[in-house]
Amino acid sequence: MFLGPWPFSRLLSWFAISSRLSGQHGLTSSKFLRYLCLLALLPLIWWGQALPYKIGVIGPWTCDPFFSKALPEVAAALAIERISRDMSFDRSYSFEYVILNEDCQTSKALTSFISHQQMASGFVGPANPGYCEAASLLGNSWDKGIFSWACVNHELDNKHSYPTFSRTLPSPIRVLVTVMKYFQWAHAGVISSDEDIWVHTANQVSSALRSHGLPVGVVLTSGQDSRSIQKALQQIRQADRIRIIIMCMHSALIGGETQTHFLELAHDLKMTDGTYVFVPYDVLLYSLPYKHSPYQVLRNNQKLREAYDAVLTITVESHEKTFYEAFTEAAAGGEIPEKLDSHQVSPLFGTIYNSIYFIAQAMSNALKENGQASAASLTRHSRNMQFYGFNQLIRTDSNGNGISEYVILDTNGKEWELRGTYTVDMETELLRFRGTPIHFPGGRPTSADAKCWFAQGKICQGGIDPALAMMVCFALLLALLSINGFAYFIRRRINKIQLIKGPNRILLTLEDVTFINPHFGSKRGSRASVSFQIISEVQSGRSPRLSFSSGSLTPATYENSNIAIYQGDWVWLKKFPPGDFGDIKSIKSSASDVFEMMKDLRHENVNPLLGFFYDSGMFAIVSEFCSRRSLEDILTQDDVKLDWMFKSSLLLDLIKGMKYLHHREFIHGRLKSRNCVVDGRFVLKVTDYGFNNILEMLRLSEEEPSEEELLWTAPELLRAPGGIRLGSFAGDVYSFAIIMQEVMVRGAPFCMMDLSAKEVIDRLKMPPPVYRPVVSPEFAPPECLQLMKQCWAEAAEQRPTFDEIFNQFKTFNKGKKTNIIDSMLRMLEQYSSNLEDLIRERTEELEIEKQKTEKLLTQMLPPSVAESLKKGCTVEPEGFDLVTLYFSDIVGFTTISAMSEPIEVVDLLNDLYTLFDAIIGSHDVYKVETIGDAYMVASGLPKRNGSRHAAEIANMSLDILSSVGTFKMRHMPEVPVRIRIGLHTGPVVAGVVGLTMPRYCLFGDTVNTASRMESTGLPYRIHVSLSTVTILRTLSEGYEVELRGRTELKGKGTEETFWLVGKKGFTKPLPVPPPVGKDGQVGHGLQPAEIAAFQRRKAERQLVRNKP
């Protein structure tokens, strides 16, 4: 922002008054200094205010009722209001408007325009094309922009002569000529009403059409009376070969009476039978509603409706909504007075609105670009604009020309609704059919002017005889086709031989290469050994075998691998994006020059091109495979130690390769550390060159690169459209500087900056300040840092060439030349030392992981079974004569689950079974599995323990029952957890079942019986079968057993069972079981009182949590 002339003059006046006051009234020096301080602060106060920009809206608002219907003041106020709310605009200026009246007489209109000089900063208008040139020259002299929607003269588009003139709509003549070209209507007639504004419009239109080489037969003016109109129509009929009649007057659809009488009399004279096409001119200046907008004037006037069949209405295309819908929506939103009827408002309202928005958009662009708001700057920054206007999309091209779309409307002479037939695309100046054909009177279009060539600046005139011209053209075409066909046949044969046959063939297929999929282990030598085996097989004449052992190579296809074997060597395939490549011949003919150039590149530091793979719809560059992979991979491997000597060797290799490419006039365009590969001898080679050239030659599209991919791209290429794909020599030098930063710090580009890749790219695009990586002097010699800064200079012309870089870099190693052999030996020595430490470290890690794995395996399977599975042996099922099984579950678990959240149920089971697992660790038992709330344990297997299995299970059961007596649920501490336990002794068979997640399972009737003992037990009770009690009694260890009586076991009948209630010497407290009813049973769930108490406490806690 700058200090404007008005505030500055006021400050000077204030300073002069202060000086006089100091002289007349003896103003002291201290007081005068205070005045000076105030004077210094005034600009700062002014600095924070937005400058006013007043837009003068010029038109014949008072002398022409049709223009007054456009409601210019309402349109301007609405536009200014919306601009003030649009936060995308620059706020340095605030917009105001003033409605300036234009006299209907052109001479007086120019005089009034001159009087408006001081009333506005820029003008929307004039509406009268008659003084557009004069107004534009005055605007240039006043440095005030002229933004017109009505000016016709194409010379106004010359920005050198009229630098402050802009069109807010496409030139109406361009639109007319585009339509006339399409239908080949060259001969035109122009007629206007007798208002001065339309007379001058007609003269300007005729002159503009003639400048395009189109003959304008008549230019007529007619009054509203029938006699005057009939005279004009007779003159048109007498003129030679007129096809199209352009009517410069107010449209009949919005109440233009002159046009209505003109069309009615033309219909009476049979001139609307298809001989002529009538085109209203004024609708080119606004968007005439047509979707769901029937016109009553056509409905009520049958003669006009029939005549309108010969009229083509060309108007600005509306998109999401019509003018009427947009106006009604604004009225409903309170933006304009609701009392206004949209159908009584001229659609020119939207054009005025769009023109003001146009100025605001240009102003915002100019301020964002250079902070200047001069008239010429606004015109320059009205290019490549796009915004949604009142009800249509407003667009301009790179020259500032409007490219908004138009639509051709038509009726069939019977209906009173307009239909869209063609879209006029002003960007391509072509017509697009919309699916509804034009209904021409008589069923066929108006005859075309076949002898006119529509050449710019050439007069349309007669040519040679059409029949003779057709015969000559046909003969020439036939001869040309014959010669081309023969040449194409010969060339096709030659190309076919060169492409796929012979030792110098370029295109390879699946018959030439064998795809492989290497899996790299921890040792680099594993891949090398396999590669020598493959190469030896290929060289001996045998096909390489792809049934490689695990960890070496596995079969692959072109779809999932980039590595293949070609002529015994490993090769790398750089795949192109999927696309329509055509056949082999079309590829060769369209990009043969690039192919040959890339094939001929031979240098030690350039990865050689071996050919191009093309098969099964895939196209790829085939180059040598480098075993050390890319420079980026080496830099990211912390295990590899790189001293400065070795880093400088890699950089010098890169410089040599790029120097060679630039000498061959070859721009890389994609240079980055991952496109620099290192072979087995630690020689760096540049690869992926020519990729962009082939994309351009084959016209292939590519996905937009990510911000991370653009970190190597020069700023000027980031800012230029298409620059990223094309590249430049200076851009390659910038990319080399970023690679230097990577090598010096062994980090990604801009890794020292605490910004995302997108933020870095945004700063690179929009300097100042110039944004670059910061490299500490400790990473490289000072002269290398200085060279890097020269290479990434903001001005491309200030960057050195690779010849200059090479001359500087080769002497950086303290005056000695870089010796790659010494660097390799030193690096190999470091690598050997690092490898020993790495092996030792990896061995220790492997041993720790092995112990963890074995521990986990023994927790899942018995140790003996786990050892057998580790050795690869089959685990045979094993029978055990006597084992004791333990089953338990939670009483009322279903009720507890229904009253708990799922995570609370998981916490309950985890806490309880963790407690059980701790107990069974002190007993000779084996935990078989847990299913839900069921817990299964066995003793006597997989390791036999004689008769101790019953005692071990009994002791464990007492311990578990004792611990459960004091166990509390975290979420329901008031509710007791009761379990029931069942024990049974008998024979079982054990074995491993399944291959995926193998399990050690028990089988036999003993398992079912033990489960029945648990399910028929009671809470806080250990239910024991007779077989278990018998063994316990033989052990004589003091187990206390009570007879329960005969119990019904499902599937077993009635058997005598017992309760295990204690053991001599067992002092741990056992929970008191619930009393047994008269039927000998208790409830197998929570008591109703317990459930009610828990629900009550839960509701109380919920109320406490919800209380504010």
Curated annotation (Swiss-Prot):
Q: Which UniProt keywords apply?
A: Cell projection, cGMP biosynthesis, Disulfide bond, GTP-binding, Lyase, Membrane, Nucleotide-binding, Sensory transduction, Signal, Transmembrane, Transmembrane helix, Vision
Name the record gives this protein: Retinal guanylyl cyclase 2
The disulfide bonds in this chain are: C104-C132
Q: Which CDD domains match?
A: CHD, PBP1_sensory_GC_DEF-like
On tissue specificity, the annotation reads: Expressed only in the eye.
Extracellular-side segments? 51-465
Which Pfam families does the record match to this protein?
Answer: ANF_receptor (PF01094), Guanylate_cyc (PF00211), HNOBA (PF07701), PK_Tyr_Ser-Thr (PF07714)
Q: Where in the cell is it found?
A: Membrane; Photoreceptor outer segment membrane
List the Gene Ontology MF annotations in alphabetical order. ATP binding; GTP binding; guanylate cyclase activity; identical protein binding; peptide receptor activity; protein kinase activity; protein-containing complex binding
Q: Which residues form the signal peptide?
A: 1-50
Which SUPFAM superfamilies does the annotation name? Nucleotide cyclase (SSF55073), Periplasmic binding protein-like I (SSF53822), Protein kinase-like (PK-like) (SSF56112)
The protein's gene is named: Gucy2f
Q: Does the keyword Transmembrane helix apply?
A: yes
Q: So which stretches are on the Cytoplasmic side?
A: 491-1108
Q: What does this protein do?
A: Responsible for the synthesis of cyclic GMP (cGMP) in rods and cones of photoreceptors. Plays an essential role in phototransduction, by mediating cGMP replenishment. May also participate in the trafficking of membrane-asociated proteins to the photoreceptor outer segment membrane.
Out of the domains of life, which is the source? Eukaryota
Q: Topology versus the membrane, per the UniProt entry?
A: Single-pass type I membrane protein
Q: Cite the domain annotation text.
A: The protein kinase domain is predicted to be catalytically inactive.
Can you list the GO cellular component terms from the UniProt entry? plasma membrane; rod photoreceptor outer segment
Q: Where is the Protein kinase domain?
A: 532-812
What is this enzyme's catalytic activity, as reactions?
GTP = 3',5'-cyclic GMP + diphosphate
Q: Which InterPro entries match?
A: A/G_cyclase, A/G_cyclase_CS, ANF_lig-bd_rcpt, Cyclic_nucleotide_synthase, HNOB_dom_associated, Kinase-like_dom_sf, Nucleotide_cyclase, Peripla_BP_I
